[in-house]
Amino acid sequence: MKEQTPIRKAVALHYDEQKDKAPRVIATGKGHVADNIIKEAKKAGVPIQEDRTLVELMRHLTVDDQIPEALYETVAEIFSFIYKLDESVKNKK
């Protein structure tokens, strides 16, 4: 029996601390749409974090939805890591 390749899924988040109470979904998709989300993020220099479990927890969200409170801590840790990485790269230039 041939093993099936899992369908790729992606969720893109944005957080504007001046406007948003929590990070919100700006794009979501699976298959080719997910591939395009990832491709555009890479092209724009947006950091990508692969986490299948987190994507599964967010799969029911739609564009402009804020993430549920239960995910605040996990997403905050990811955003913090990305921010620190970004600052580290800027300081090396």
Curated annotation (Swiss-Prot):
Protein name: Uncharacterized protein YlqH
InterPro entries, per database record: T3SS_FlhB-rel, T3SS_substrate_exporter, T3SS_substrate_exporter_C
Native species: Bacillus subtilis (strain 168)
One GO cellular component term: membrane
Gene Ontology biological-process annotations: protein secretion
